[in-house]
């Protein structure tokens, strides 16, 4: 596993996404997994982008 540093705003958005998934009936653990996986994918793709 690797660490992803998120801004406060990004953390808030992640919490909101988790809460939305839970409101749709998804368990908290599964909601966290879904959001964490999405964040890892975004972070991985950001790392691949060449810096200017």
From Swiss-Prot:
It comes from Haemophilus influenzae (strain ATCC 51907 / DSM 11121 / KW20 / Rd). It comes from the Bacteria. Disulfide bonds: none annotated. This is UPF0181 protein HI_1434.2. Belongs to the UPF0181 family. The lineage of its organism: Bacteria, Pseudomonadati, Pseudomonadota, Gammaproteobacteria, Pasteurellales. InterPro entries: UPF0181 (IPR005371).
């Amino acid at each position: 596993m690797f660490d992803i540093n998120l801004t406060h705003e990004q953390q808030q958005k992640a919490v909101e996404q988790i809460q939305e998934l839970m409101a749709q009936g998804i368990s908290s653990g599964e909601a966290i997994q879904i959001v964490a996986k999405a964040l890892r994918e975004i972070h991985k793709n950001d790392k691949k982008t060449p810096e200017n």
